[in-house]
Amino acid sequence: MLGFAIALALPFTLFALFPSWLKSMPKSGGWMNVIKVTLGFLELAFALKFLSVADLAYGWRILDRETFLALWIVLFALLGFYLLGKIKFPHDDDDTKVSVPRFFLALASLAFAVYMVPGLWGAPLKAVSAFAPPMQTQDFNLYNNEVHAKFDDYDAGMKYAREHGKPVMLDFTGYGCVNCRKMELAVWTDMKVADLINNDYVLITLYVDNKTRLPEPVKVMENGTERTLRTVGDKWSYLQRVKFGANAQPFYVLIDNEGKPLNKSYSYDEDIDKYVDFLQAGLNNYNKKK
């Protein structure tokens, strides 16, 4: 939302500071309509992103990853053809000439659409990982190097870890967390990282913005104030704050079978070597406690 606000306010701010710039602007005409249509396509693309966050949080499953990508591919392909003059709208000029900047913008839009096509079969698409739904919503996936959580419930995951004698990796995340998606596709897809998480840890992913209602509201005390936990996300957010003193995502913490941290927590940092060291240090500390 901050990005939208800045983008809309910046032109007015600049023209207010430098009124003479208005004189150098070309008169309104077809070029203005092209800008409006282009921004309209971009607005639709970002609207789908925000809709996907709500879709995930409430569990509607309307916009799975491949559905989202298919819609984005269509939007950016249409934008590319529009900029090339192949598609006309009612208020567009009849001029068939395409300027050089407009041509390169069309080329970029079409290239972006083509880039996303492999994502329909499960390709990571790191460039759009911050916007697309998580990989686990993909129904058809030819790629098998992704990391998927064994549990999305803390108690069930801890019970499994105790029974199998493995340390636990808690992943506090959110459906609307951009940096979480970046970490999952930029770091977790590394073979060393994926091998450590899949084979040596029990991964429990807890979504702090999960809107699923709890069977019964739970009243808790936090900092001397009574709070009511009404959703699953409220429960995991409360757990993160009270047990680990943090409220940001992504937030990774390695714990033993008693729920005690094995080393320092880890937040957003796409350095793969650091992440491997973080996982290996936790595993070493767990083995020392045995």
Language-model-detected regions and their locations in the chain:
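CheY-like receiver
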Residues: G157-Y160, L239
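Loop/turn elements at helix/coil->beta-strand transitions in domains of secreted/extracellular proteins
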Residues: H164-V168, N199-I204, N247-P250, N257-K260
